Amino acid sequence: MEVKANQAKETKKGVLKRIAGPVVTAVNLDAHMYDVVRVGNEALMGEVIKIQGDNVIIQVYEDTTGIKPGEPVSNTGLSLAVELGPGLLTSIYDGIQRPLEVLVNKMGNFIERGVSAPGLSHEKKWTFKPVVKAGDKVEPGAILGEVQETNIVHKVMLPPNVKAGVVKTIKAGDFTVDEIIVILEDGREYPMIQRWPVRVPRPVKEKKNPTIPLLTGQRILDGLFPIAKGGTAAIPGPFGSGKTVTQQQLAKWSDAKIVVYIGCGERGNEMTEVLTEFPHLEDPTSGKPLMERTVLIANTSNMPVAAREASVYTGITIAEYFRDMGYDVSLMADSTSRWAEAMREISSRLEEMPGEEGYPAYLAARLSEFYERAGLVETLNHQSGSVSVIGAVSPPGGDFSEPVTQNTLRIVKVFWALDAKLSQRRHFPAINWLNSYSLYLDALHDWYDKNVSPDWNKLRSWAMGVLQKEAELQEIVQLVGSDALPETEQITIEVARMIREIFLQQNAYDAVDTFCDMQKQYDMMKAIRLYSDLANTAQAAGVSPAQITTIKAKNELPQIKFVKDYKQPLAKIEKDMDAEFNALRSAA
């Protein structure tokens, strides 16, 4: 598919006829759908979203206060596109890929209107090393060379929407992103920079079934409800249940090579937290600051609503670009509900027929359009790359039956349900293990067998069984107390408490417990299973539940979470536990 030309073309100017918040109507404007236009005397950036006869309806990505009918509107002739090339990593952009650092230097802490800034620095020079030579045939999307951007190698590619060709000359050395680095035999010239329309998914050779988990270091996610690389997940939850902290934990510790974090309509303080924390935190795989693998898109709640839609598309396009280099990318969108609310506002300004709860009828289509751009793929240059999308959903009052949550659940394959009751009990992450699910378990079964342990999947099923059994017994316990239960079920209640408090609870602010690798998760779960087996054997031998639940070694188990070199202390606890149970059985 040929994408619109990079250069803006001058067209006849239109005139503003009507203004309704972020939606304006122009007349006498020669425009196509999704053209980027400049609105008013201040040249505010907007996008054509509807054409009705001579009326061109535009959503404006900046505040429209003070503009009036009669002001000019000019069409750039381009669709909303992002600049892709060296310099993306460590950047922080607004929803339309204006670097906030550049805007601060231009106008201070408060963004003025009508200011444009390129997404990449056009002055900075990058050292380009070619990987192809003169005479080589290059296909669309082929890797031409490399730039050491941070600790990550940025692969410079031929745009995916051009014809194949033969390299005539290719240069090595220091260049800006605009300088020509390769000339093909048919005379076509290409720099390091590409521009790509955000609404058009970047092409791939084929989509594949995901079979490798995206490891996050969070026990409840990796252990019970894993997401695959190239998978989709939703984190719905009421206010204050920990959506943003969970998203930030995933951005910090997930084993993706690149992280794109979109703050879409959420509080500005949350983006500030990411900006202040990430440069000081070390990436566990590379040992470098986490910021070096991150692209941030800050579109906070006080920014114009129309730009929320742009921020989501900008983020996924940048993620696809890194995927095309053969990297695993994880994209966090916090929160897709704010984007849906922006759609609702724009839709009502357009006087469209509302759907459920006032959301537009095309809500489901837009959400699936976004989530379907995730996936594990074979790229055009025959590499394997993936984009994993994790979207937070903020249902008002924690009502999971509202349209955004329901439509999201229909699309995604992993559901991490945050629970206000758990967060009020200070159980974090507050993910409800009874309501959550992952549809990737079967696909990831073999990976866990080979890379963790052949009995990991059985251990996981056992833990889930114990937690479900506890939920069934909870009603009786609340009515008559746990002492009225049969002895075996008293032990089940105790083992479930251990799984909850030792395995599922995790402290995001503890230097060790914030990230837990799969081996440690397996060893912790195995220790709890050992206690369960020893307890059931002791109970069958006549030992009372009161004695079983008060053994000393068990009380030391929770401390293992906070110990980095845990192998020896854990082996000692298991040995002591065995000895104590032997003593109890002998006494019985």
Swiss-Prot record:
Lipid bilayer topology: Peripheral membrane protein
One example of a Gene Ontology biological process annotation: proton motive force-driven plasma membrane ATP synthesis
EC numbers: 7.1.2.2
CDD domains with a match to the protein in the record: ATP-synt_V_A-type_alpha_C (cd18111), V_A-ATPase_A (cd01134)
Primary location class: membrane
Gene3D superfamilies: 2.40.30.20, 2.40.50.100, Bovine Mitochondrial F1-atpase, Atp Synthase Beta Chain, Chain D, domain 3 (1.10.1140.10), P-loop containing nucleotide triphosphate hydrolases (3.40.50.300)
Residues annotated for ATP binding in this entry: G237, P238, F239, G240, S241, G242, K243, T244
UniProt xrefs under Pfam families: ATP-synt_ab (PF00006), ATP-synt_ab_N (PF02874), ATP-synt_ab_Xtn (PF16886), ATP-synt_VA_C (PF22919)
Keywords: ATP synthesis, ATP-binding, Cell membrane, Hydrogen ion transport, Ion transport, Membrane, Nucleotide-binding, Translocase, Transport
Single GO MF annotation: proton-transporting ATP synthase activity, rotational mechanism
Span of the signal peptide: none
Subunit structure: Has multiple subunits with at least A(3), B(3), C, D, E, F, H, I and proteolipid K(x).
Protein known as: A-type ATP synthase subunit A
